[in-house]
Amino acid sequence: MTLSPYLQEVAKRRTFAIISHPDAGKTTITEKVLLFGQAIQTAGTVKGRGSNQHAKSDWMEMEKQRGISITTSVMQFPYHDCLVNLLDTPGHEDFSEDTYRTLTAVDCCLMVIDAAKGVEDRTRKLMEVTRLRDTPILTFMNKLDRDIRDPMELLDEVENELKIGCAPITWPIGCGKLFKGVYHLYKDETYLYQSGKGHTIQEVRIVKGLNNPDLDAAVGEDLAQQLRDELELVKGASNEFDKELFLAGEITPVFFGTALGNFGVDHMLDGLVEWAPAPMPRQTDTRTVEASEDKFTGFVFKIQANMDPKHRDRVAFMRVVSGKYEKGMKLRQVRTAKDVVISDALTFMAGDRSHVEEAYPGDILGLHNHGTIQIGDTFTQGEMMKFTGIPNFAPELFRRIRLKDPLKQKQLLKGLVQLSEEGAVQVFRPISNNDLIVGAVGVLQFDVVVSRLKSEYNVEAVYESVNVATARWVECADAKKFEEFKRKNESQLALDGGDNLAYIATSMVNLRLAQERYPDVQFHQTREH
């Protein structure tokens, strides 16, 4: 049976994100993946000292200064017979909310681990999020051009700490200065490493067969024997790759390599297009939507302001779940129940924006947004339903924002509300005074807000500490009891950027007392968009 042209397009799509701890090499891997996808001609190393060639996926002013990818961008490139959408997630610890939401828009993740360090804190956190949806995970053990920990130990650590079985696909031969290449367990081939070829795709020399004398000649007898001994152990102690278990999120295929040396990345990409799922079904509040359906549906998982310094615009990122987008089609924005014609959607090659004529499930569209689109918005061809599972987290850190020039209050409020709609921070406006309290999941976000208020809204502001420990969104089925609660706690209530009522607690004890005193009021730690 031949698939219809539409289903062929759906089957070609692979949409994934990279998760890692800061500095495990995520941005470098992104570069090399794009190099293999022929999306960029030469890979820019991330912190080129004094060079102007910034990594292709880092592009806001502050990222340029700090050499980190703060905003999630989207890159599409062809690889073999597939079209791959790579969603870049911020690697720095603070940008978790944006990252969490990005993970709701992918069908698969690549976990990058620094093989000298093993499993780190941020990786654990991100893996917890992928667990919520049993997202399939591929693993890349990076930095083999440095001295690494024992590979068996690394696999054990992943299995014990992240509760996922490891199935090694390739195995390293030496490391650091002695790194010679990797052996492919399923093809019975050894790929030999040459250093210093990181910016180009190199012709790799292949030795077929583990017992081939050419292998001893190429890597030296000692390393060749060590490889054979290790593989005996590996075959006895580790999982075999099983595609069904991989798709269920129970085992992860593991690849070894060095992104900086541009070696091993293509083995991982081969695995990705061969095993990772085509676009998956998604849950709405009324039913499950399959990618094969012909009616268009999609949801917004991120909003980013000023992607283009030349245009003061904001772009909403929408994941296509089903149906085909065509230029000029009429879509219903479910939250407002309004129909909109979308004729200028964007597709992305990081930093370069081009208008798109059509898009399929798994693809990410950029919609121009003048403040009417919110995170979590569902678009359909008329059906009234909402995709679920796009979270907002209660912030853990709070600061008061104060203006240097009190006359700019209006611009400040506008800037903060726009930044909060984008999910960069959350804004709380206390009901009883004129303060503006900003909540974030990590400290770096406050610096980002102050620097963006200055560069994008021309507002000079500073932040100072405020007596707030945590916030909870509140609601109550009993209107009378809710009114009483609101009257008695007015000094601790605030509205967030979307005008939802929140309780601002000065300490965890204060929050507990309020919860005990008002058992009918619900205090929520997350809010669905």
UniProtKB/Swiss-Prot annotation:
One of its GO terms (cellular component) is cytosol. Pfam families: EF-G_D2, GTP_EFTU, RF3_C. It is found in: Cytoplasm. GTP binds at residues 20-27, 88-92, 142-145. SUPFAM superfamilies: EF-G C-terminal domain-like, P-loop containing nucleoside triphosphate hydrolases, Translation proteins. The keyword Nucleotide-binding applies. Gene3D superfamilies: P-loop containing nucleotide triphosphate hydrolases, Peptide chain release factor 3, domain III. GO terms for biological process: regulation of translational termination. CDD domains: RF3, RF3_II, RF3_III. Its main location: cytoplasm. GO terms for molecular function: GTP binding; GTPase activity; guanosine tetraphosphate binding; translation release factor activity, codon nonspecific; translation release factor activity, codon specific. InterPro entries: EF-G-like_DII, EFG_III/V, G_TR_CS, P-loop_NTPase, PrfC, RF3_C, RF3_dom_3_sf, RF3_GTP-bd. Increases the formation of ribosomal termination complexes and stimulates activities of RF-1 and RF-2. It binds guanine nucleotides and has strong preference for UGA stop codons. It may interact directly with the ribosome. The stimulation of RF-1 and RF-2 is significantly reduced by GTP and GDP, but not by GMP. This is Peptide chain release factor 3. It comes from Escherichia coli O139:H28 (strain E24377A / ETEC). The lineage of its organism: Bacteria, Pseudomonadati, Pseudomonadota, Gammaproteobacteria, Enterobacterales.
